[in-house]
A protein has these predicted regions:
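A conserved beta-strand-loop-helix scaffold within acyl/acetyltransferase catalytic domains
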Residues: 1-4, 9, 117-168
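N-terminal-biased segments
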Residues: 3-17, 105, 109-116
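Structured beta->alpha junctions
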Residues: 10-13, 46, 165-168, 199
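Conserved acetyl-CoA-binding loop-helix of GNAT-fold acetyltransferases
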Residues: 11, 17-34, 166, 172-187, ...
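Long, mid-chain structured domain cores
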Residues: 22-25, 33-51, 55-61, 69, ...
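Active-site/acyl-donor-binding loops of N-acyltransferases
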Residues: 56-86, 192-240
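Short amphipathic alpha-helix that is part of the acyltransferase structural core
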Residues: 83-123, 239-240
Length: 240
């Protein structure tokens, strides 16, 4: 019951163009209906294959028109170190501010996380076994936690910038950019040469920043789109 997520749909190349994928996807919908599931969603990377094959299939089966879900941004330290904003908002100018390694957060910091208003996807406690201690940082103001940037090692030579949060009253002072810059500078000084991040489509401020200040220094920019199918259960069908 509840909602479902489609994780993978694949048809061998020699067997394509025979509506096998369409029949598989339709069968998934029928099984979910029997299990009283009300909605199924899919998130996928935009490629020539998904544009030519998956999106027409979703349309044919009554899925909602795909919408942008995330922008995936890739860069290297050689490229990003050219960004002028890296030195524009140093945390050393933040009177009363204290930057610390997130891997060393105190129990009081953990308690204060719950007092801040942040979206679930920005949790600093996700994927702890891959936490990158090199440049995961916390930010306090007068001993109160006000933000964090959490990164994860996703490959030997690549760090993912997973979560960036600053309490709302400090955002007008560009403290988020300050934290991001500090983390990037730490990576630039390390042997880890690649970085990646995903920006949610509903994070308007970060999308603007990414397109204006990150995009000129990227090595790759990819889209993830999302589509949903609302499932009408038999018990909810109106009599004719």
């Amino acid at each position: 019951s509840g909602d479902a997520e489609l994780l993978s749909l694949f048809v061998l190349p020699p067997c394509r163009h025979q509506e096998i994928g369409t029949r598989l996807l339709h069968a998934v919908g029928q099984v979910l209906k029997e299990q009283q599931c009300r909605q199924v969603s899919v998130i996928y990377e935009v490629t020539p294959l998904t544009t030519a094959a998956l999106e027409p299939m979703l349309h044919k089966l009554g899925w909602q028109p795909p919408q942008l879900a995330f922008l995936l941004m890739d860069t290297t330290m050689e490229r990003i170190k050219q960004a002028p904003w890296l030195e524009k908002y140093p945390l050393s100018d933040f009177s009363g501010g204290d930057v610390f390694p997130w891997g060393d957060y105190a129990e009081t910091d953990r308690q204060q996380v719950d007092l801040l208003e942040w979206e679930p996807e920005l949790s600093p406690f996700r994927d702890p076994e891959r936490l990158e201690r090199l440049n995961s940082l916390g930010l306090r103001y007068r001993e109160q936690l006000i933000g964090w940037i959490v990164t994860h090692r996703v490959a030997l030579d690549q760090i993912r910038y997973s979560s960036l949060f600053v309490a709302e009253r400090f955002r007008t002072k560009a403290r988020g950019i300050s934290l991001l810059s500090a983390a990037i500078r730490l990576q630039i000084a390390s042997p880890v040469v690649k970085a990646t991040c995903a920006v949610a489509a509903d994070n308007a401020a970060m999308l603007r920043f990414g397109r204006r200040h990150l995009q000129p220094y990227l090595t790759g920019l990819r889209e993830l789109r999302q589509s949903r199918l609302e499932i009408v259960l038999e018990s909810e069908k109106k009599p004719i």
